[in-house]
Regions:
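Acidic, glycine-rich flexible loop segments
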Residues: 105-134, 138
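Tryptophan-anchored aromatic micro-motifs
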Residues: 39-61, 91-93
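Bacterial Sec-dependent N-terminal signal peptides
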Residues: 21-39
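N-terminal glycine/threonine-rich, aromatic-flanked beta-hairpin/loop signature
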Residues: 59-102, 109-110, 136
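Bacterial N-terminal signal peptides
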Residues: 12-24
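Edge beta-strand at a domain terminus
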Residues: 100, 141-167
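Bacterial N-terminal signal peptides that target proteins for export
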Residues: 2-13
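Hydrophobic/aromatic beta-strand elements that line small-molecule binding cavities or substrate pockets
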Residues: 66-71, 91-97, 122-132, 141, ...
Length: 167
């Protein structure tokens, strides 16, 4: 069994102190790391929206749906809605803040025929404005349906009203 002598205790204390100082110098504290993380953008988070669609030319209403979106740090976006899951996939894409303070999200999802065969892709462009309190948003939507050859077959427009989910 090893006994601690004053010399071994001093060496242990010195090596422990050296290790603690090295960890601190390398960013071992939350304070050191927090200074390097940029502030979150106000749009980041989980949102629920209500969307009203219309024919872009005539303005005739085409129905609507409720949707969920996650705007992630760094500009990634993921969205889904309450439309039948067998008709479409989840929407993925990107978002960015414009110089005017509005946001543009570009998303895409796969569309399917009733028998499950591929029908093409849907491309969405959402232009969003956050309220001053950061808890609600409004926006416009432009949507282009593409066939399996990437030819435009339908264009739909819409409006969106959303609220942040959680804090």
């Amino acid at each position: 069994m090893t006994q601690f002598t004053p010399k071994s205790a001093a060496l242990f204390a010195l090596s422990s102190l050296t290790m603690a100082l090295l960890m601190q110098a390398c960013g071992g504290s939350d304070d050191a790391r927090a200074q390097t993380v940029p502030p979150a953008d106000p749009i980041e988070g989980f949102w629920q929206s209500t969307v009203a669609l219309q024919d872009c030319s005539s303005g005739a209403p085409l129905g609507g749906f409720r949707g969920l979106t996650i705007f992630a740090a760094g500009g990634a976006a993921t969205a889904d809605n309450n439309q039948p899951p067998m008709s479409k996939g989840i929407a993925i894409g990107t978002w960015k803040k414009n110089a005017t303070g509005t946001y543009v999200a570009e998303l895409r999802f796969w569309r399917y025929q009733p028998d499950g065969a591929p029908a093409g892709q849907q491309r969405l462009t959402r232009t969003l404005t956050l309220a001053a309190d950061g808890k609600t948003l409004t926006g416009t939507i432009s949507s282009v349906s593409l066939d399996t050859g990437d030819n435009a077959v339908r264009t739909v427009c819409g409006t969106e009203n959303g609220a942040r989910v959680g804090s």
